[in-house]
Amino acid sequence: MRKIYIFVLLALLACPCGLQAADTLFVREKQVPILIERVDNVLFELKLTATQAQQLDELVLDFGQETALRHIRSVKLYYGGTETRTSRQNAFRPIDYISSLDPGNTLAANPSYSVLKHKVRRPRKQVVLKADQTLFPGVNYFWISVEMKHRKAKLLDVVTACVSSARIDGASVTPVLVSPQGVVHRMGVGVRKAGDDGSKAYRIPGLVTTNKGTLLAVYDVRYNNSKDLQEHIDIGLSRSTDGGRTWEKMRRPIAFGERGGLPMAQNGAGDPAILVDKNTGEAWIASIWTHGMGVATAWWSTVPGMSPDYTAQLVMCRSNDDGRTWSQPTSVTPQLKDSTWAFFFEGPGRGITTSDGTLVFAMQYTEFDAGRTPHAGLIYSQDHGKTWQRHVAAKDSTTEAQVAELSDGTLMLNMRDNRGGARSVATTRDFGRTWTEHPTSRSALREPVCMASLIAVPADENVLGRHILLFSNPDTVRGRNHITIKASLDDGMTWKEVDQVLLDEEEGWGYSCLTMIDAETVGILYESSVAHITFQAIPLKDIIHSL
């Protein structure tokens, strides 16, 4: 379906015959989150190439029945100017109107790039937006923004709308929609944005729900830039007790400072994974700590051995008070690493407690060869984290993985594969002593070579009464866009197109992590196009339609 709309868009904008692009008002509606705390959120982008038209007078916006109008503070119309005469791109904007990357400029439209034409407060079902904009000869860009009531909007609110008509030079015209109809805009919260708490970037989300229903979100706090280790990076944690609507002040459960007398940028900790021991209620964070390698890229700089002066350390810390406070991190590298390996660390995201009480994290290691060949597997503890074990890897050329327990107790490892194209999947019945390639491996779940999330939801823990696998990633083989949640009702044998929901089609960093907020609602923490770390809540019924 996506290819059809792209073809239509190109045909309408590029074809010199038939329906003329000139003087036609084209409308594009993108599937992106609406952040509750933002002053501006892009709802529609509009493009008008003026050859004869002189003025855009007004636009008429109609909201759908599902829209929570009482929670919308305002709707705005902006003029985005024109485009270079030499541009060959079929763009709908000359630049991003709101930045997700520029610290301090992540909440509102940058006035350097947009002219506010009209603002309607407390909108009704139909809104008339006055433009009265003299058209520049050639391309003209406009966009419509929506602002929610920050304290009243709910995570499960939605916005649906259409640009039903326009007036150009006093004449009524019908806009041409070049994107799919029926886009449902879902609410989100920017848990971490560029510049928050003095950090340039936040990456690598992990998410769990504690036994008390608290959400614990972990991530990299990348102070200087978005670069991977080695850099000045700590593990940050945000805590929510209201299902993700609000988040407490950031904590830093893992931070090594100037350990060993080295600068903070040579003591980075990153790529966190988090799990909750369902039997004890304790929460565990696993992370990699890099030390003694200057500021070179850790993937290529860590070497065989066991000492932190030579090789990266897999460290863990735990909380026994629902994530409020955390123990000092300790290294489990001596228990787990083969001294001949170069890099050994966890799979970022989350771990699990199996039905027999075993704690399991995904892991990965690299050989000390020219290509640093990676392998994914798992580590586990059968004494509530006192000691950890591992066996053999599932497959080579695989890295960031996530583990889930199937309905029969088998463990499934879903792996990022450096060969690209699709996820690798393997299963084990003995905690990784032996592995079996899954029938869907390298075929069922496409990927652009990126981290992904996989969780299992037992039948007695969801309102549908079915054992469900949920998977999220950029549903593409190019770029990191189209963040999608998919569901499988047969232990991952099939992933039906009807059982999925698209959350964000724009480009981002693409990592994600899933959890169940309650028996009806899925929570996702991900690197979106609108904030470094975004949280959304999605009802299961909006994902699964085949039942």
Protein language model regions, located:
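Bacterial Sec-dependent N-terminal signal peptides
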Residues: 1-22
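Extended intrinsically disordered, low-complexity coil regions enriched in Ser, Thr, Gly, Ala
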Residues: 54-56, 61-98, 102, 152-177
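A generic structural signal for ordered secondary structure
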Residues: 6, 14, 43-47, 316, ...
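Asp-box/BNR beta-propeller blade signature and adjacent active/binding-site loops
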Residues: 40, 52-54, 82-84, 104-105, ...
